[in-house]
Amino acid sequence: KDKLSNRVDIFIEEKAFSVTEASNFLEKIKSDFYITAHANQFTSGGLKVGVDNGAVSVDHLEVITDQEIDYLSKSDTTGVVLPGCSLGLGIPFAPARKLLDYNCKVSIASDWNPGSAPMGDLLMQASLLGSTEKLSNAEVLAGITCRAANALSLEDRGSLENGKIADMIGFKTNDFRDILYNQGKLKPSFICKRGKIYN
């Protein structure tokens, strides 16, 4: 009503909001908000609710069937995998390789929080996910740049293209592969925000 937010995030799980509760809630608010759903972390079922209600992203996906992956691949929803949660809770990673092989849009995020993902280094997490899931450097870097921007409804940034906002970070290296090879130890040498460089 007061336009304080343009996004809603709902956790769809047996011990949070049920599939029915989430469906009823999202049906009422989907015309006014971007939707993100945290789903399929421990049980399947929530992904379909998110996709059916036009979610921009569905996050987690550690527990997901082939049918759900196929359903996601035929939608505009970005699947966001959260390797920090898997590391923090000792559960398997979301099947990022299979998601990409099905042509799903896949982003990588940290879900940094004190309960299940207390490690905040996205590059370290993305590097470990890439090694475990057999992702290429390009797939991992896309997952934390352009696809991450899509998951946040920020299509005006995330890649270096004419007409897009020049938000980026730079690393002092002669080989872009060093960024992931160093698993978070290589730190940015500069930040560029809206075309302005900060050292």
Cite the ranges covered by each PLM segment.
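Metal-coordinating catalytic core of metallo-dependent amide/deamination hydrolases
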Residues: 1-45
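Hydrophobic anchor at the start of a short beta-strand
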Residues: 35, 106, 189
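Receiver (REC) domain switch/active-site residues of two-component response regulators
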Residues: 6, 56, 167
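Generic beta-strand/beta-sheet core signal
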Residues: 11, 38-40, 80-82, 109, ...
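Active-site-adjacent C-terminal substructures of enzyme catalytic domains
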Residues: 21, 44-159, 177, 183, ...
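C-terminal cap of metal-dependent C-N hydrolases
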Residues: 144-146, 162-199
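Structural signal for hydrophobic packing residues in well-ordered secondary-structure cores
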Residues: 1-2, 29-30, 148, 152, ...
